[in-house]
Amino acid sequence: MIDFTGTSGRHEGNFNAPKAITRAAVLYVFRCLVGADIPLNDGCLKPLRLIIPEGCLLDPAFPAAVVAGNVETSQAITNALFLATGALAASQGTMNNLTFGNARHQYYETICGGAGAGNGFAGASAVQTHMTNSRMTDVEILEKRLPVRIDSFSIREQKDSQSLWPGGAGALRSILFLEDMEMNLLSGHRTIAPPGLAGGQDGAVGRGRIIRADGEEERLDAVEQASLYAGDRLVIETPGGGGYGRP
């Protein structure tokens, strides 16, 4: 039985997850735990009893906004279930949804981060995790099609001396803008770290900032909208995964 009783009520923003998204996240987790190649169909959920309170964050009533429920809340569901079963420490827990554009250009990407560790294995660094289901545009194609330059795309340093099996590190992505654009960021784990498991260290929290052309820096919240001008840089550091066990 998977009982979501006690879940918060409908979110005033757009982090509400339709019931179908909640069911999909549960299905994903338990198919991972089976450890065998089984067909994907409705029968996978038959052995499970789901209790999802009507009207809550995970089954909101119309006209609740739901866009972030698919890309962000679904990640929270998977992390919660893997932690509850003791199978896996938390992964980055967000898709780091980034959109930017102007009258001529529009672009959307999700940015990779750290995966959680488990009993006998470390977490992978700078990978798409769990519900993301997407890849990133090649740098060469992105720079050819849009007036931006990727200054840096690397793995963050994440020191973990507390865990027997360390979590994966997040990524650092720096984008230089050559034209004025509007930017939106929809992300998570900027304040609360992705939890470790069985005494393992928590993953690093994510960070974001704008470095203006004159050198001034502006810190970004997890959910943010901002105007970017030619010469500005956007720097996103994604969360790391939690570690597993004590040495």
Residue ranges of model-derived segments:
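Glycine/proline-enriched, intrinsically flexible loops and inter-domain linkers
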Residues: 1-247
